[in-house]
Amino acid sequence: MSKAYFIGAGPGDPELLTVKGRRLLDSADVVIYAGSLVNPEILKGINAEVYNSASMTLDEITGIILKSVESGKKVARLHTGDTSFYSAISEQIEKLRELNIEYEVIPGVSSAMAGAAILGQELTIPEISQTVIFTRLEGKTPVPETEKLSKLAKHKATMVIFLSAGMIEKVKGELLQGYSENTPVVIIEKATWKEQKVVRGQLKDIVNLVKDSGIKKTALIYVGESLRASSESLGKESKLYHKDFKHGYRK
C-alpha cells in the first residue's frame, strides 16, 4: 500500500509552495485539490490524475485516497495555505487512520503569514503586542464560548481573522467589545494572487472599507495597534540587538 500526503499549497503565489511540497506534487500519481481555493497555476505541468474536491464529500475524498493507495499510487491531497489552519484535514486523517492508510503532513505558507509580508512588517511589536490571535467569527461552524470574538477582543492583542469578511457588520460589533474604534485594521483579499486587494483603515470604518472595495470572501482581517508599524515609526526595539544585551552568541 502506498502513502497519502497532505500538502499546504501556500496562499496563492505558486512560488510560495515549499520545495518539498513541489517535489511531492510533481511525483504524485493522484492529486486531490481544494478547487475553490488553490491557485490552478500550481497544478500546471503535473502528470497525475487530478480531482477537484470542491463538490466532493468526505467519504468521496477518502474513497479516492483508499482506492489509489491500494493500487500502489502516491496521493497528494492539496490544501490552501498551511494545513494547520481551517483545512479540515483532521477529519480526513481520522478516516485514514480507520483505514490504516499511512499519511504525512507537509506544512505550507499560511495566508496569515503572507499577509504580514505584504504589509512589510512583523505582527509582534515590543511593548505593543507580543501575542497574535488567529481566529474566526462563528458561522456554520460553532466556536467555544470562551473563544467568541468579543471575548478575544478584550485581550487587545494583534488579531488575524479568517473566514469572516462576509459577516463584517457582526465582526465590527464583536471587536468593539474590546478594541477602540480607532484601532488600525487591514483587510487583504486573495493574498499573493494577481487579484489581491489590500484595504487599510480604522475599526470604526471597517464595514464601509469592505463594502466599498467589493471584498466578499477569501479575505483576512488584521486588527491591532501593531499594524501601525507598516506605515509609521513606532520607536519600539527588542532587546535582541541592543548593544547592552548579552547572550550566548554575543558577550
PLM features per residue range, with description:
Residues I46, L119, L123, L175, ...:
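Active-site catalytic pocket residues across diverse enzymes, especially alpha/beta-hydrolases
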Residues S2, D13, D82-F85, I89-H155, ...:
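Class I SAM-dependent methyltransferase SAM-binding "motif I" and its flanking Rossmann-like core
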Residues E15-G21, L37-V38, T62-G63, G120-Q121, ...:
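A generic local structural motif
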Residues M1-V109, A114, A219:
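Class I S-adenosyl-L-methionine
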Residues R22, I42, K67, L123-I125, ...:
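Short secondary-structure boundary/capping segments
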